Amino acid sequence: MNAAVKTGLPDAHGLRALRFRLQGRRAVLLAELRAHVRAARAGAPAEPGGDEVLLAQLRELDLAEAQRDAGELESIGVALGRMESGEYGMCLDCANPIGHARLAANPHALRCVECEAAHA
């Protein structure tokens, strides 16, 4: 039996694939955050007769999206750091393997399903 299957941790090939996905997602999030910053700096000029309430709601939505992206970006950074330190794939809380299926669905998961449910 292969060691990765035995431990529930990704093998070297799986780890490379997950690292590639994390790095790709990080690049997308950084581009989105840059766009949020540019939009915030530019501001939406009020048009004559424009709907101020709608503009305010759009700004709030943009801020919420930027905060979500920043949180995901932070999780990705932690996951990449754990890859470098050899701790990737181990639950932060119980130290058991997170599991292939969970990491495939969410490569920046830091907890196993059970601990994440208890943490939420």
Model-derived features with residue positions:
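Short, cysteine/histidine-rich loop/knuckle motifs that typically chelate Zn2+
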Residues: D93-C94, E114
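Short Cys/His-rich "knuckle" micro-motifs
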Residues: A101-N106
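Short functional micro-motifs and their immediate structural scaffolds
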Residues: I98-G99, A117-A120
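Short alpha-helical
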Residues: V28, I98, L110
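Cys/His-enriched microdomains
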Residues: G89-L92, L110
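Interaction interfaces in information-processing and related assembly proteins
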Residues: M1-S85
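Cysteine-rich micro-motifs
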Residues: A109-A118
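Short metal-coordination and nucleic-acid-contact micro-motifs, chiefly zinc-binding Cys/His arrays
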Residues: E84-E87, H108
